[in-house]
Amino acid sequence: MKKVFKKATATVTAAAMLASLTACGGGAASSATTAAPAADTKAEGGAETTEAAASGIDNKDIKIGVSIWSSTDVLGSQCKLILDEAAKALGVQVQYVDQGHVSEKVTASVEQLAAAGCQGIIICNSSDTEMTSAIKTCNDNKVYLAQFFRVISEKNSADIYQAAKDSDYYIGAVHEDEPENGEELVNILLEKGDRNIGLIGWEQGDATWLGRWEGYKAGVEKWNKENPNDKATLSEPQYAGTTSEGGSKAAEALMAADPDLDALIPAGGGGDPLQGAIAAVERAGKTSDIDIVSTDFLPDLGERLENGSMAGESGGHYCDPLISFMMVYNAIKGNYKDFGGKFEDVPFPYLYVSSPDDYKAYEKYFVDQLPYTDEELVDMSKLSMDDLKAAAAKVSIEDAASRAGN
C-alpha cells in the first residue's frame, strides 16, 4: 500500500547536474573558494555572468564560509550546487571546508573560515558540543553564524542553546523534524508488510541521527501497540560512518545476524552509506526480499523505485542550507540585526516518495532544473526574516510548479 505525502521541499539530485560540479578537494578537511564571477567569465556551473551578477549589486568583497561534512558526496554536492548558484546570483564569494563530521575538524573549520576572512559562516555540525567552540570563534572574530540541517537542543544542551541565544553573531538554525521523518519512513515499511527491520546509523551521538532513531522507534512502538498479533522488530543500529564501504559492511552484518530480515533503514550520512547498503543487498541476491528506505535522495532514485532496490525515501531538502546562506548574507549586509537574546528557529519540510509516480513529479521541477532561477534567488535575498521563514516552509513541488508557470 502506497502512501501519498503532502510534505515537500527542494533538492537537486540529477546525475547530470552532479556532473557539472567541480569537486572541492578530497578528504575530510579540504577547502575551496568560489569567487564572485568577473565580467565575461564562466561561473562554476558554466553559465556566463556579468561582474554585477544577477542582483545588480557589487558584493565581491563578501565571503561566506560553508563548514560541511562533504561537498562531494550525494547530498553535499547537491547543497554545493545551490549554494554556488546563490553566490553567483548575488555576486559573493563562497568558501567550503569539508570536515567529515569529525569533531575536532568541525571546530577547526570554523577557525579556518574566520581566518580566511569570511564575514559569515553556515555550518552542518555533528553534535551540539561543537557549537560551543563555533559560537566563541564567531563572537571573537565578529563573524555571523547559522546552522543548516542541525539545531541546538534547548532541552538536552541548555547551556549551549543559551550561549547561542546570547550571542550577537549567532543567528539561528534551519533544520528538519527528524523524529517525524523517522516515523514516516518506518511506516512506509510497516505498511508494505515488513516486520524485521535492520537499522544502520552513521555517527554515534549525531543529533540528526538521534532524532531519526527516535522516530523509527516511535513508529514501531505505535504499530506494535495497535497490532499486538502482528508485531514488528527494529534492530539495534550498526554504524557505517559516512562511507559506502561502511554502509555495505553494516548491511552485511545485519543480514548475517537475522536470516528473516525483510527491511533495512540506512538512516543517512550523506547518501554514500545508503549506496553501500544497496550494493550489499544486491550482492546477496536479496533485492526482492529486503525493502530499503532512507533519507537523502540518490541521483538514480527513480530507477531504484522502479526496480525495487528502494522502497521509499525522504529528501529533497538540499535547499535547507540555502536558507541559512540567505540569513548570513542579510546579516552581513545589515538587513538582519540585533541577534542577541534571539534564536531564529527555521523548520524545513521533507519530501517523501515511495513510488515511481511520486518521483516523476519531483524530477520535473528539482532534477531537470534548479528549483530557483537567479532572479528568484535575488528576490529571496531581499525577504525579511519572517518572509524568509515562510518561503522555507512552503518549498514544495506545487510551489516550484507554480513559480514555473505550471
Indicate residue ranges for each PLM-predicted region.
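Repetitive helical segments and hydrophobic/amphipathic motifs
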Residues: 12-16
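A residue-level marker of the well-folded mature domains of exported/periplasmic proteins
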Residues: 2-7, 17, 24-406
